Amino acid sequence: MKGDNMIKKFKLILMIITLVLFTSSHLVASTGDCRRGTLDKAYCDEDLDLVADLPQDESKWVNPSTIIFTYTPVEDPAVYANIWDGFVRHMSKTTGKKVVFFPVDNNAAQLEAMRSGRLHVAGFNTGSNPIAVNCAGFVPFAMMAYEDGRFGYEMEIIVQKDSEITSPTQIKGRTLAFTSPTSNSGFKAPSAILKGEFDLIAERDFTPTFSGKHDNSILGVYNGDYEIASIANSVLERMIRRGVIEKEKLRTVYKSQTFPTTGYGHAHNLHPVVVAKVKQAFYTYKWGENFKKEFKKADRFINIRHKTHWDVIRKIDTANGVSYDCK
């Protein structure tokens, strides 16, 4: 009899445990609670790879008839629509879907388009990548590089050739042109470097101004509208190759370590079958002459991990006190 009572108690305990587990899992599912780290509450990161997971609810997966693709808004969108034309056609053939290149004028517009579901595949610039990942559900998987794995660009602080400025220390008391607050080389990296290496802080030691894009800053210094600017040298080199500016008329007073370039990726809820084909399009694309001429520092797309390749950029954000509030 005593043994029967013990068995009954044991069964009762098992039933209670099962009920508790079922109830708690139901609550988690219904409230959308999950591990997400620094990601916005709209996303989950159960595998802790620092990017948004594919939704467990398949009804939230997106399988568009037309894939919308955009490139980071660093220069004239019309120029880049032509440069990316061959790739767009290759992606269309690989995925079996219509692909449209969607030009954007600024980082904010690109981020909002991804967050709202209007973008499926995109290239976000170095500084915007962590913001796009945390606030817009962007999942980067590729970057331009050489066959041997080399990649990247540097931040440069430039002046006109005949400027009296020869060192960042001489920025004090002057106006420095940044590009936009989300840009790595156009704002975040130089801010951290100027503060850490030269004890120069915007508003306290110099006046900051924002041009909007790297080409605006470069042309601003070139034409004398800005005295000093921090820019991505990859953009500078492309403008020189296209004959937009003459290299001899500008001078570099500071050059940073190498940073990762634009990260290419997809919306977190894009159907996995489509994602696989999109990745295939990137990794199998044979670069045409226009592409090689424009992106001369690289010759292929390589696989990347946001957690690894963007570690230095997240550290720069931390040094600048940047938090991904996703407002």
Regions found by a protein language model. Give the residues of each.
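Bacterial N-terminal signal peptides
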Residues: 14-23
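Short helix-initiation/N-cap motifs at beta->coil->alpha
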Residues: 101-112, 202-219, 258-260
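Bilobed "Venus flytrap"/periplasmic-binding protein-like clamshell domains
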Residues: 69-92, 127, 150-219, 226-228, ...
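Ligand-binding "clamshell"
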Residues: 132-144, 239-253
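Acidic, polar ligand-binding/catalytic clefts
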Residues: 111-170
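Periplasmic-binding protein-like
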Residues: 72-73, 147-156, 183-185, 244-316
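N-terminal hydrophobic or amphipathic helices and topogenic motifs
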Residues: 2-3, 7-8, 25-109, 292-327
